[in-house]
Amino acid sequence: MKPRPAGFVDNKLKQRVIQYLTSNKCGKYVDIGVLASDLQRVYSIDYGRRKRNAFRIQVEKVFSIISSEKELKNLTELEDEHLAKRARQGEEDNEYTESYSDDDSSMEDYPDPQSANHMNSSLLSLYRKGNPDSVSNTPEMEQRETTSSTPRISSKTGSIPLKTPAKDSEGGWFIDKTPSVKKDSFFLDLSCEKSNPKKPITEIQDSKDSSLLESDMKRKGKLKNKGSKRKKEDLQEVDGEIEAVLQKKAKARGLEFQISNVKFEDVGGNDMTLKEVCKMLIHMRHPEVYHHLGVVPPRGVLLHGPPGCGKTLLAHAIAGELDLPILKVAAPEIVSGVSGESEQKLRELFEQAVSNAPCIIFIDEIDAITPKREVASKDMERRIVAQLLTCMDDLNNVAATARVLVIGATNRPDSLDPALRRAGRFDREICLGIPDEASRERILQTLCRKLRLPQAFDFCHLAHLTPGFVGADLMALCREAAMCAVNRVLMKLQEQQKKNPEMEDLPSKGVQEERLGTEPTSETQDELQRLLGLLRDQDPLSEEQMQGLCIELNDFIVALSSVQPSAKREGFVTVPNVTWADIGALEDIREELTMAILAPVRNPDQFKALGLVTPAGVLLAGPPGCGKTLLAKAVANESGLNFISVKGPELLNMYVGESERAVRQVFQRAKNSAPCVIFFDEVDALCPRRSDRETGASVRVVNQLLTEMDGLEARQQVFIMAATNRPDIIDPAILRPGRLDKTLFVGLPPPADRLAILKTITKNGTKPPLDADVNLEAIAGDLRCDCYTGADLSALVREASICALRQEMARQKSGNEKGELKVSHKHFEEAFKKVRSSISKKDQIMYERLQESLSR
C-alpha cells in the first residue's frame, strides 16, 4: 500500500503565513495563537467564520511544514557551501604544490600532513617486512606504494622494484618529494644513501630539495615565534588585568586621609556657629580633661542646612584648624550590591579611623544611607543604619585616647533615623541657615579677599541686593562678575583700537575684517563677529592694558541677572525692588507694620528691656487689589530680612500627613534663617473656620499651624504676616493674641490716597509722560473712581497709555510727521469707558461692615 499523505495543505494559507513571517510583525519568536488571530483579522473574508481552535491547528500544521522546508533548504545551502569550500581548498592546494609557495595562513588553517604520510609508509613497510605474503599487491596498492615511497627519477633510469624501498627503508626516514593531492608529501629514502653513498641518484633536484627544507624550517620557526609572541602578549594582558584588580581592591580596601588647608577665617558670616564649634572641639585637644572628669566626650556632629550654605567647608575648616587628617567619604560610596559588603565597608571605615586616631570622619549626604527604618524599602538600608549605630557606640567603648570625631552633613535632617540623633551619636546638631544681610556682607568680604576690587567698594550695598543668597551663590556671583569685567575691558580695548587703528598690541580686528569682506551685517552679526575676533586673537594682554582691570560694583549688578539663588528654589522670594516709595498712601498701615516688624529688628535691646519677646503677627485684610502683598514685600525689603512667601493652597497635599509636614518644614526653614518673615497669601484657604462636622485634612493643617505659631517651642525672630480677602471665614483661634494678634484693614483708598497712588504709578507724571491738560487731582476726585482700588488705578493709567500709543500709530500710518508721545486728558476719558471697578457697591458695603467688626 502507498503511504498515507500528510494531509491537504492550503497553498494560499501557506503563502499568507510566509508573507506574515517575512513582514517581521511577529518579531523573533512566533506565537501560533497570535499568528492565527492576526490572519483571521486581516483576512476576515476567508477565515473570519472559521472556528478559532480548528484554524489554529491548521496554521500550526502549515507553520511546521514551512519550518521543515526552511531547515532542509538551510541544510542544502550549507552542504553546497561546504562542497564549494572543499573545491576551492583543493584548487589552492594544487596551486601550492605546483608553485611551492610558502603561505603562513595556510599553515595555520590546515595541519601539516607530513607526519601522517610518514606513519602510513612506516607501518606499511613494517607490515610488509613481517608478513610479505599476506599482503596482496593490488594495482591500487602498488600505485600508492610507488607514489609514496619511490624517489622521483628521470625516464632514463626506469623504475625501481617495490621490494627495494622496503629493504632500504629499514631504520630510515622518508621525505616524499613526489607531488600528490596534499602538499608537502615528499619522501626520500635516506637509507639508500647510507647503504650506498657512492650511488648517484639520477637528476635529483638537490637545490630544490634544500630550498624546500629551508623554507619548511623557516615556516615552522615563524609559527613558533608567532605562538611565543601571542603567549607573551596574553601573559602581559593577564598580568595587567591582575594588577588592575589588585589596585582596585587596594583602593576599595581603605580610603586615603586628606590634609585640609581651610581655616575658620575662610568661613565667613557664621561667627556664632564657629563659637559653638570651638566649645565643642575642646576634647580633641585636651582629652585628659574629660577623662579626669569621667565624662564621655561628644563623638558626632550633624551639620544641616540648605544646599550651598557651607557644610562641607565647615567640616574641612574644623580639620584644618585642629590640624587633623580628615577621612572624607560620600554616603553612596558605602552602598554595595553584594549582601553584607556595605556593612563591611562601614566597619573597615571606623577601624581605619581608630587605628589612625586622632582624626575626623566626614560622611557627606548621610541621609542617603540612614533613612528611617520604619519606612525603609529594603532590608539593606535597615542593616546599614544598624551597623552605623553600632560603630558609633563602639567609639564610646574605646578608650578616651582614641580621639575620633564623626561629622555628618545633610540637607534633610528630618529624614534621618531618630536613633542616630540621640545622645552619644549625632547629639550635636549645627544648623547653617540662609545668611542675613550682615552675614552676606562678611561672606562677600571673605570671598573677595583675593579679587582685584576698587578701593571704595560698597559691600553693604551688594549684600542688600542679594537676599536669599547662600555662600555658593555668592561665589558664583563673584565668578560671573569677573567674567563681566573681562568682557567689559576687552570691549573697551576694541573701542580704543577703532579710534587708534595703528595700535598693534591690542586685539586686532584687521583679520576679522578680512574674513568678513564687504558684506553688510546686522547688529547681532557685528556683535558675534566682534566676540569671535576676541576668541581668535591669541596675543596676551600687556601689563599696561591690564593695569586698570578690576571688578567694579556695576559688574556685580550685571551678574545678578544671571545668578539664581538657591533659596529661591527652596521657597524664599527675593524682593530687591519693592520699597515704601513704590506704595502710595497707606501711611497709618505703614506705621503699624514698622512698629510690629521693623522696630524689633532695629531696636532689639529696647524691646527686650520692656519684656516684648514674642514677635507679633499681622493679618492684612481687605478687598483684592488694595496692595496687601505689596506691603508685605516692602516690609521685608526695608527691614533686610529673609522673606518666605507661602501661597495658601500650595501646602495642601492629598496624602495623609504631607500637608502638616509642609507646614512644619516652612517654620523650620524660617527658624534656621532667622530673622525671617513668613508671608501667608490667601490664608483663608489654609485656615478655614473649623466646625464639629469637619474631621479632615484641613482641620489637621489648622491645628498644626496653631501649634507652630504659638506652641511649646518659641519662635524667635520669626515674624508672621498673612493676607486675606475674607477674614470672616478664618478660624478664630488664628486671630488671638500671640498668633495673628494685629489685624490691619487695607480698604478702598479715599480721594487723597488715590491721588498719592496715581502720582506713584506715573512717577509724578514722568512715566508715562502726561500732557499739560491732565489733572491727576481731578481724576482722583472723580466720582467714577469711588470704588477703584490701587490695581484699578494702575489699569486706568495703562489703558490711557495704550490709547495714546494707538493714536500715535494711526498718525504715522496716515503719513503725518511723528509727534511727541504723551498721555492727554481725552485718553483718560477713553480709559474710563473701558476700565470698570473690581469692587461692586454690594461688596463695598460688605467690606465696610467687616471693617467695623474688626475695629471693635
UniProtKB/Swiss-Prot annotation:
Placement of sequence motif Nuclear localization signal: 85-88, 218-232
Binding site for ATP: 305-312, 622-629
Crosslinked positions (Glycyl lysine isopeptide (Lys-Gly) (interchain with G-Cter in SUMO2)): K208
Tissue occurrence: Widely expressed. Highest level of expression in heart, placenta, skeletal muscle, pancreas and retina.
Residue ranges, compositional bias (Basic and acidic residues): 205-218
Residue ranges of the motif Nucleolar localization signal: 49-52
UniProt cross-references to Pfam families, sorted A to Z: AAA (PF00004), AAA_lid_3 (PF17862), Nucleolin_bd (PF16725)
Region (Interaction with WDR74): 267-474
Annotated positions of the Phosphoserine modification: S134, S191, S211, S215
N6-acetyllysine: modified positions: K70, K156
GO molecular function ontology, one term from the record: ATP binding
Skewed-composition ranges (Basic residues): 219-230
Coiled coil: none
Assigned GO CC terms: membrane; nucleolus; nucleoplasm; nucleus; telomerase holoenzyme complex
Comp. bias (Acidic residues): 92-111
Biased composition (Polar residues): 114-124, 133-158
Highest taxon above the source species: Eukaryota
Region (Disordered): 84-175, 197-236, 496-523
Location of the region described as Interaction with RPL5 in the Swiss-Prot/TrEMBL record: 1-220
Gene Ontology process terms (BP): positive regulation of protein binding; positive regulation of telomere maintenance; regulation of protein localization to nucleolus; ribosomal large subunit biogenesis; ribosome biogenesis; rRNA processing; telomerase holoenzyme complex assembly
Keywords: Acetylation, ATP-binding, Isopeptide bond, Nucleotide-binding, Nucleus, Phosphoprotein, Repeat, Ribosome biogenesis, Ubl conjugation
Modification sites for Phosphothreonine: T138
Job of this protein: Participates in the assembly of the telomerase holoenzyme and effecting of telomerase activity via its interaction with TERT. Involved in both early and late stages of the pre-rRNA processing pathways. Spatiotemporally regulates 60S ribosomal subunit biogenesis in the nucleolus. Catalyzes the release of specific assembly factors, such as WDR74, from pre-60S ribosomal particles through the ATPase activity.
Similarity remark: Belongs to the AAA ATPase family.
Subunit structure: Interacts with NCL/nucleolin. Isoform 1 and isoform 2 interact with TERT and isoform 1 exhibits a higher binding affinity for TERT compared to isoform 2. Isoform 1 interacts with MTREX in an ATP-dependent manner; the interaction is required to associate NVL with nuclear RNA exosome. Isoform 1 interacts with RPL5 in an ATP-dependent manner. Interacts with WDR74 (through WDR repeats); the interaction is independent of RNA or pre-60S ribosome particles.
Name of this protein: Nuclear valosin-containing protein-like
Native species: Homo sapiens
Lineage, uppermost ranks: Eukaryota, Metazoa, Chordata, Craniata, Vertebrata
Gene that encodes the chain: NVL
